[in-house]
Amino acid sequence: MTTATTQPAAKPTETLASYTPPKKDAKVIQQAEDDDAVAPDATGIGKMRWPVRGRVISNFGGGKDGVDIAVPEGTPVKAAENGVVIYAGDGLKEFGNTVLVRHENGLVTVYGHASSIEVQRGQKVKRGQEIALSGMSGTTDSPKLHFEVRKNSAPVDPSGYLE
C-alpha cells in the first residue's frame, strides 16, 4: 500500500499591501446634487411612478427622509422618472448601495439598500428603466427599498410626487 504525501504550501515571495476601503463621505448627496449633469426631458406625465411594487413599511416624517418599501431581495428597482444618474455607489453608510437620479424639474430621487446597482454616474435613464435590485445593504434588517424625493437638497414627502 502506498501513501500519498502532501507538499507544504508555497510561501509568497512578496507581501501584498493591505486593502484600505474607500472613505465614506457624509456629504455624498450634497456633492452629487452639485454636479451639473443635465437630465433628459421629463415624460410630461406629471407624477412619478413608484420605483417598486411592495408594502410601505415606513412613511415620510418623524425623522424619516423618505419611505421604506418592503420587497423581496432582488426585486428590480425602476427609475421614477426620466433623469440622469448623479451618484451610484455605497458612500452612504446607512443606505448601502444607493442610486441618486436628478430629474429635469430639479428634483432628485434616492434609491437605497440595493443588492446591486445596474447604472453608473452620468448615465441617462428613462422612467421605468431598471436601475438597481432591492436588497439589504447598509443598515437594515430586512430586504427593502428606501426611496426619497429631494427638492433643493431637502427631503420632501414622496407621496405628493407619486402616481
Language model feature labels by segment:
Residues 61-63, 72-74, 82, 90-91, ...:
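Solvent-exposed coil/turn segments that connect beta secondary-structure elements
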Residues 58, 71, 87, 113-116, ...:
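A residue-level detector for short acidic-glycine micro-motifs
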Residues 49, 70, 77-80, 111-112, ...:
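Small beta-strand-rich domains/subdomains or short beta-sheet motifs embedded
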Residues 93-100, 143-145:
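Short aromatic-glycine-enriched beta-strand elements
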